[in-house]
């Protein structure tokens, strides 16, 4: 009888512990757009009062991100095809095997594109940009600390990884004869020691670049180069930005918010 009570007590404590873990489970709930990069769409600089400056994540029954509130709506007047981000629009995310499908601005009449990602062992293998009946497919090849992005075997970008973080992107420029004539180089620096909660979440719109890194960069600079006599020479273009971040008691950057059950 005494042994039976001990066994029952063990299972009771174990069950309570598991229940407590379940209750205290935390998920990424919001991301401030200051840490995102929408580099494949023309975003209007016009202030939108209907946007909270954060995207908000919802999850399905398997704890996978299924909906993101905060997506694109068109700017109608003098927009030149540009969009703004609004809390009135959301993205829908579905899964099939290794593929992740993202329906951008799912509840809007005018939508810029949809996306499909193939992710293998937390590595991006390909992404497809779907615009109407047209598809643009990017494939990714891995070699040492470099990741090469190609379209139909044409080099588009090279990503350099150091210590688990993306430190450099080189985007190659071509002339009409498909010869490289220059490049745009982006350097990421001043990484913190805080966990990047967007790591491997390539499918979140705007998070593709950040998803390569385990930590958060706090500075980046972009320079343009032209190819002259076999060497890359600065074309004079330059842009830099510093991201101010603070951290909570769990050392999580203030660009993220987590919600615990």
Where are these predicted regions, by residue range?
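Sec-dependent N-terminal signal peptides
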Residues: 6-10
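Positively charged n-region of N-terminal signal peptides that target proteins for export
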Residues: 1-5
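C-terminal motif of bacterial Sec signal peptides marking the signal peptidase cleavage site
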Residues: 14-15
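Buried hydrophobic residues that stabilize the cores of well-folded domains
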Residues: 18-261
């Amino acid at each position: 009888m005494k042994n039976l009570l001990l066994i029952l007590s063990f299972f009771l404590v174990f069950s309570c512990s598991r229940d407590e873990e379940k209750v205290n489970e935390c998920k990424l709930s919001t991301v401030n757009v200051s840490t995102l990069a929408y580099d494949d769409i023309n975003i209007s600089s016009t202030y939108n009062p209907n946007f909270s400056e954060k995207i908000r994540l919802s999850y399905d029954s398997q704890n996978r991100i299924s909906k993101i509130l905060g997506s694109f709506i068109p700017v109608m007047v003098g927009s030149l095809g540009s969009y703004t981000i609004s809390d009135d629009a959301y993205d829908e995310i579905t899964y099939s095997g290794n593929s992740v499908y993202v329906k951008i601005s799912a509840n809007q009449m005018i939508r810029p594109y949809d996306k499909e990602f193939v992710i293998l062992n937390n590595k991006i293998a390909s992404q497809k940009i779907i615009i109407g009946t047209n598809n643009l497919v990017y494939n990714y090849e891995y070699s040492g600390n470099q990741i090469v992005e190609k379209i139909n075997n044409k080099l588009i970008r090279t990503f350099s990884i150091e210590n688990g973080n993306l430190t450099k992107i080189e985007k190659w420029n071509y002339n009409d004869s498909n010869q490289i004539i220059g490049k745009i180089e982006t350097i990421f620096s001043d990484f913190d020691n805080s966990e990047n909660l967007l790591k491997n979440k390539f499918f979140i719109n705007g998070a593709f670049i950040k998803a390569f890194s385990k930590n958060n960069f706090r500075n980046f600079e972009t320079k343009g180069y032209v190819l002259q006599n076999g060497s890359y020479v600065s074309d004079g273009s330059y842009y830099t930005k510093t991201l101010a971040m603070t951290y909570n008691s769990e050392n999580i950057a203030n660009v993220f918010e987590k919600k615990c059950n």
